């Protein structure tokens, strides 16, 4: 941007009051924010007097980098205060330019004493560990409340623990936990949840009815009344042919008016119920074959109105009037008891979870915000001190992406805001608020958006940034065409037509560049094709074909770096999807066509093929009488049963489950029976094995018996598959280490993780993408831009399963379904909650669509499929009203992005759509709509007009057909990978040291999919040689005792006391004690090496976590970038701070060969030298004293070995 617009200037320069900047996509938001910070600094505000809050670490780092660059540029100008600017530049890295979590952590570190918090806490960064601790808390609370004969809790539990979903009570409590943790006063919020159920002897007088249901019904039907009235007054209704239609609608209108009046006047509930019931049967008419075209056309409109009216009446009746008032009161009263029990249980869960974390001195991310708010909000002198500190420290608080803030974060900001001392500068775009699953509340943005516009006082200002400097005019017009029909004050909270439209501002593009946006639609006629929740194979082929075509046409891209035109490259293209579920299939199809594809986020870990197979195998080991898991395993590469074989087995035993059929087929003397017998023998062995072994041992046994690791490694993306399977083994180990047992419980735990979308996958490659097409989710693309964007899966159905469950949680309420003996019925709170939640979900889906479409710089291509294209076009043509808006009822009935896009683009007066059939070689199933933007007064172009353009489009369609027909040969490109992540664990690095002295990896294998340098794991795990506990488990237990050993207690039974304490705290499994070698522990703690520990125990540091940036080439000789750094994370067993330096040590429980002890010790020493050197380097970086000695404590040999 060569210069700032008038509105940008205001956002940069206006001072002295609170400002909300509503910045549309591509409007230069970050540039404006950086320029404002620069102007503040130049005006004398020091950088440490500003608080700049973002919501991601990447955004915070980018902000720092940009501010540094701006300051550096300013310093080069003549006449500036160079010394002052240099001082500000040096402070950027330590300034409060950070995520809100990082700021909260600063608050806790400064004022921990005000809430009596141990300052040596550790941040819990492992989601699995946090989940396991939460699971433990949940099980403890569940067990206590069920055994305490608490009738209310039992009622809650029975209401949700149905035969089909025994985990539903737990799921509810875990879901509620996420909502509660985003609230500033979570206990108060939980305690008020039952209040909305309060009801005495009248439904009409209840809180829920008066505050929510009554206004909703009145508003909903007033719009329908107006619509009906407008039709009844039309002249055509006076014709005798429509006499019955008019009579029917007039009667319906009268009944509806009576009902609405009864609602407004708070008439008796049962009276309202009967009035609404009378509306259902009053609209009844038919059309006549004798009518002319005008009458038939009008009839179609009135028929649509009839359907809408019936639908609204029926939905309202089933939601709010399904039962009598007496029954409704009983449902509300019973529901209130259950919600009270839920609220009580949730508070207990939170408190128990917090206690478990405190016992380990751990904090998780939700703790940071909760504790920071606690510190800042209490009515105490220490809290006042904290508030005063930050209010005096910061002259301005700048919040980026303000639309993503939640209620707790907003309250934290308000605690450090002072009307007299500082101001707020908030910038964001509510149209891009897409993090509802993180409890982001766009309503907070909208509240200020409307308030600041209405007040127009000297204390508050709203600034709109609408100029788009990212996209060409066709892209901005496509975005406007879609969203001016969708976003409105009653859907999305803003009037897009008046205040939200993008203004084309990228005037730097050459005039010859603009290209039409495109919609590519595949007509899906085969019922066997994929569901509407998946991307169709033909859809992928259309994308591939269009890319090939663009490449063959030498499509030109304007390069903003050089200011010149150039040929399109693969890296100019991004493919955006709503979810990651189809990523692997897309990757495989691109590999077949040798088009490079860079995937920024993997498929959901639990949905990968290898994990699906493995989890299903575990399910049938637990219980083989499960048809779907059993058939999945049989069909997998482990056993390779094909469809014919499975059909043959089923035909032989049609009336039994598949396991019985399989067992029965073994008696048949043929090749297939042997195959069945082999499978059943292995299954029987594994089921027996499972009864006497740990889950982790069972998993590894499956890997060994089936060669699963090798089979999956041989498939495309095989190394990633292998790592995913190894990760499952690690998760099982962690699960058992946390004290959990049982295969069934483990399967349920994984299922809950899957349902909550906890992704445990190892990261994919983070190498430079190079010249490759990018594939990413829409959420992953936020903040990015690409010359050409394909948005695929327009038909993908929106997920509304939350509405079908037994509970619904909103920001201010929780609605439940009451379970009676033979039926379930929604409470009024649940019915109203469903309506609210559905609109919230659909509004967010519209905003997600906005983010997707605004990523494109020069060309936007929308791709999807429909069952019947012509039928869809006909539907779309009637949906927009005279103002060019989709009616609210249509928006609330949307099932996919295509529900929004189709009507918007089909009937926009700026858009001419030319429909061309692709030739029969692909079964005429593909349709392409080339969208060209005309002047405002251009009329809609029919198919027989503009022949030249049609011929050109036909030529393009034929070329696309030829390209599709070329896509056949499979030529999978195996590529060597030599990249690594920017993060490495020492436990991984030490595996990679072939030569620990030189720290080289010349002979090691590179596991591409994990993106970490590792040697292949081919050795059997130690537990296969153990009868009870593994060497690793015994070693871990030994480390634990040495970690907590009390060097201030010299009693003879000190060791036994320590062990007993650890068992009591549930940190140590009592069963392992007999396997410990206490003599080894006694040798060390009372030996010469530890004698100084007794003298100065405070100088002894144990289990110290560290993170350190090291040169990549220090670790990996062949790393290409000599300047690259890698973040190394590890845990040091211990070090002692002596007067002259640091003595570093590490316990090792490795077996020492007593027959050749010297050689054995030397091998162990070589094995761990590299690891200790990393620890030494890290300690030297963050400690004032230097390491003067490194030692391995070899417990098995009872020797202390120095490492040079």
Swiss-Prot record:
Gene encoding the protein: addA
NCBIfam families: addA_Gpos
Sequence ranges assigned to domain UvrD-like helicase ATP-binding in this UniProt record: 2-472
Protein name (database record): ATP-dependent helicase/nuclease subunit A
Matches recorded under Gene3D superfamilies: 3.90.320.10, P-loop containing nucleotide triphosphate hydrolases
A single GO cellular-component term on record: cytosol
Task of the protein: The heterodimer acts as both an ATP-dependent DNA helicase and an ATP-dependent, dual-direction single-stranded exonuclease. Recognizes the chi site generating a DNA molecule suitable for the initiation of homologous recombination. The AddA nuclease domain is required for chi fragment generation; this subunit has the helicase and 3' -> 5' nuclease activities.
EC number: 3.1.-.-, 5.6.2.4
Annotated family: Belongs to the helicase family. AddA subfamily.
Membrane-spanning parts: none
Co-factor requirement: Mg(2+)
UniProt entry tagged with the keyword Chloroplast: no
Binding residues for ATP: 23-30
Catalysed reactions listed for this entry: Couples ATP hydrolysis with the unwinding of duplex DNA by translocating in the 3'-5' direction; ATP + H2O = ADP + phosphate + H(+)
Quaternary state and interactors: Heterodimer of AddA and AddB/RexB.
Gene Ontology terms: biological process: double-strand break repair via homologous recombination
Assigned keywords, A-Z: ATP-binding, DNA damage, DNA repair, DNA-binding, Exonuclease, Helicase, Hydrolase, Isomerase, Nuclease, Nucleotide-binding
Presence of the UniProt keyword Hydrolase in the record: yes
Pfam families noted in UniProt: UvrD-helicase (PF00580), UvrD_C (PF13361)
Coiled-coil stretches noted in the UniProt entry, renumbered to this chain: none
């Amino acid at each position: 941007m060569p210069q700032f617009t008038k509105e940008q200037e205001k956002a940069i320069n206006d001072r002295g009051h609170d400002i909300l900047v509503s910045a549309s996509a591509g409007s230069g938001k970050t540039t404006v924010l950086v320029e404002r910070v620069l102007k503040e600094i130049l005006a004398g505000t020091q950088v440490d007097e500003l608080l700049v809050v973002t919501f991601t670490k990447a955004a915070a780092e980018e902000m720092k980098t940009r501010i540094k660059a701006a300051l550096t540029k300013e310093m080069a100008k003549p006449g500036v205060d160079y010394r002052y600017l240099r001082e500000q530049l040096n402070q950027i890295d330590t300034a409060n330019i950070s995520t809100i979590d990082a700021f909260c952590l600063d608050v806790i570190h400064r004022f921990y004493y005000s809430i009596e918090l141990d300052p040596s806490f550790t941040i819990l960064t492992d989601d699995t560990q946090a989940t396991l601790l939460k699971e433990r808390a949940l099980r403890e609370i569940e067990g206590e409340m069920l055994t305490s004969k608490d009738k209310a809790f039992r009622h809650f539990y029975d209401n949700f623990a149905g035969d089909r979903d025994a985990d539903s009570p737990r799921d509810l409590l875990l879901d509620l936990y996420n909502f509660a943790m985003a609230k500033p006063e979570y206990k108060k919020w939980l305690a008020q949840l039952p209040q909305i159920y309060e009801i005495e002897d009248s439904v009409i007088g209840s809180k829920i009815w008066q505050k929510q249901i009554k206004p909703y019904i009145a508003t909903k039907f007033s719009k329908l009344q107006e619509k009906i009235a407008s039709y009844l007054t039309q002249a055509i209704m006076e014709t005798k042919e429509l006499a019955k239609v008019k009579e029917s609608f007039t009667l319906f209108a009268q009944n509806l008016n009576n009902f609405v009046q009864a609602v407004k006047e708070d008439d008796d509930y049962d009276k309202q119920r009967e009035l609404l019931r009378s509306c259902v049967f009053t609209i009844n008419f038919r059309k006549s074959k004798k009518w002319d075209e005008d009458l038939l056309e009008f009839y179609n409109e009135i028929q649509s109105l009839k359907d809408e009216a019936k639908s609204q009446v029926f939905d309202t009746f089933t939601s709010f009037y399904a039962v009598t008032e007496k029954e409704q009161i009983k449902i509300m009263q019973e529901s209130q008891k259950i919600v009270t029990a839920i609220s009580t249980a949730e508070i207990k869960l939170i408190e128990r979870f917090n206690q478990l974390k405190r016992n380990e001195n751990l904090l998780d991310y939700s703790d940071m915000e909760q504790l920071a708010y606690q510190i800042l909000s209490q009515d105490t002198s220490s809290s006042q001190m904290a508030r005063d500190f930050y209010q005096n420290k910061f002259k301005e608080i700048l919040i980026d992406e303000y639309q993503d803030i939640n209620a707790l974060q907003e309250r934290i900001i308000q605690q450090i805001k002072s009307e007299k001392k500082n101001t707020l500068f908030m910038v964001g775009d509510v149209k891009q608020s897409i993090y509802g699953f993180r409890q982001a509340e766009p309503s907070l943005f909208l509240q200020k958006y409307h308030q600041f516009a209405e007040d127009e006082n000297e204390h508050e200002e709203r600034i709109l940034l609408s100029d788009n400097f990212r996209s060409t005019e066709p892209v901005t017009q496509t975005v406007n065409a879609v969203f001016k029909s969708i976003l409105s004050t009653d859907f999305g909270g803003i009037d897009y037509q008046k205040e939200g439209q993008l203004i084309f501002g990228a005037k730097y593009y050459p005039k010859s560049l603009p290209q039409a946006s495109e919609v590519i639609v595949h007509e899906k006629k085969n019922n066997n094709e994929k569901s509407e929740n998946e991307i169709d194979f033909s859809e992928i082929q259309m994308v591939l074909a269009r890319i090939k075509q663009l490449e063959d046409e030498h499509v030109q891209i304007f390069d903003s770096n050089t200011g010149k035109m150039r040929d399109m490259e693969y890296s100019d293209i991004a493919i955006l999807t709503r979810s990651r579920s189809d990523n692997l299939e897309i990757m495989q199809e691109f590999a077949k066509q040798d088009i490079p594809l860079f995937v920024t986020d993997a498929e959901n870990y639990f949905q990968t093929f290898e994990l699906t197979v493995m989890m299903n195998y575990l399910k049938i080991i637990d219980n083989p009488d499960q048809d779907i898991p059993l058939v999945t395993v049989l069909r997998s590469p482990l056993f390779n049963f094909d469809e014919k074989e499975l059909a043959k087995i089923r035909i032989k035993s049609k009336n039994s489950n598949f396991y019985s059929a399989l067992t029965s087929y073994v008696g048949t003397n043929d090749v297939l029976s042997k195959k069945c017998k082999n499978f059943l023998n292995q299954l029987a062995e594994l089921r027996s094995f499972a009864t006497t072994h740990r889950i982790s041992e069972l998993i590894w046994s499956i890997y060994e018996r089936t060669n699963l690791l090798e089979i999956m490694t041989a498939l495309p993306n095989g190394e990633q598959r292998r790592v995913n399977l190894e990760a499952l083994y690690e998760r099982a180990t962690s699960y058992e280490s946390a004290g959990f047992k049982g295969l069934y419980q483990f399967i349920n735990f994984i299922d809950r993780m899957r349902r909550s979308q906890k992704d445990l996958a190892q990261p994919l490659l983070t190498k430079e993408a190079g010249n490759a097409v990018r594939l990413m989710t829409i959420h992953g693309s936020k903040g990015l831009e690409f010359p050409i964007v394909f948005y695929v899966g327009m038909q993908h159905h929106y997920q509304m399963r939350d509405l079908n469950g037994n509970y619904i949680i909103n920001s201010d309420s929780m609605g439940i379904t009451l379970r009676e003996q033979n039926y379930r019925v929604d409470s009024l709170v649940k019915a109203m909650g469903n309506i609210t939640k559905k609109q919230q979900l659909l509004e967010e889906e519209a905003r997600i669509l906005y983010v997707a479409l605004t990523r494109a710089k020069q060309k936007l291509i929308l791709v999807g499929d429909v069952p019947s294209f012509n039928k869809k076009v006909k539907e779309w043509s009637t949906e927009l009203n005279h103002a060019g808006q989709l009616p609210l009822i249509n928006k609330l009935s949307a099932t996919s992005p295509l529900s929004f896009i189709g009507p918007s683009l089909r009937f926009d007066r700026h858009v001419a759509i030319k429909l061309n059939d692709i030739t029969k070689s692909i079964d005429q199933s593909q349709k392409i709509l080339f969208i060209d933007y005309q002047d405002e007064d251009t009329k809609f172009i029919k198919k027989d007009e503009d022949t030249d353009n049609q011929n050109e489009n036909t030529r393009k369609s034929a070329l696309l057909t030829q390209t599709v027909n070329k896509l056949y040969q499979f030529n999978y490109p195996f590529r060597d990978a030599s990249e690594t992540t920017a993060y490495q664990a020492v436990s991984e690095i030490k595996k990679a040291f072939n030569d620990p002295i030189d720290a080289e990896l010349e002979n090691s294998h590179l596991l591409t999919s994990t993106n970490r340098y590792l040697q292949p794991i081919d050795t059997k795990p130690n537990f296969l040689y153990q009868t009870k506990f593994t060497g690793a488990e015994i070693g871990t237990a030994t480390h634990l005792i040495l970690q907590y050993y009390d060097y201030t207690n010299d009693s003879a039974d000190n060791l036994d006391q320590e062990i007993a304490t650890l068992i009591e705290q549930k940190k140590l499994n009592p069963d392992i004690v007999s396997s410990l070698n206490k003599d080894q522990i006694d040798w060390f703690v009372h030996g010469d090496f530890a004698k100084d520990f007794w003298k100065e125990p405070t100088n002894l540091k144990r289990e110290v976590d560290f993170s350190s940036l090291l040169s990549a080439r220090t670790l990996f000789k062949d790393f290409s970038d000599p300047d690259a750094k890698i973040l190394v994370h590890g845990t040091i067993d211990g070090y002692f701070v002596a007067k002259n330096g640091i003595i570093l040590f590490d316990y090792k429980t490795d077996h020492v060969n007593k027959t050749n002890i010297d050689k054995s010790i030397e091998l162990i020493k070589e094995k761990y030298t590299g690891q200790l050197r990393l620890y030494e380097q890290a300690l030297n970086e963050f400690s004032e004293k230097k390491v003067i000695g490194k030692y391995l404590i070899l417990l098995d040999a009872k020797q202390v070995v120095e490492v040079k």
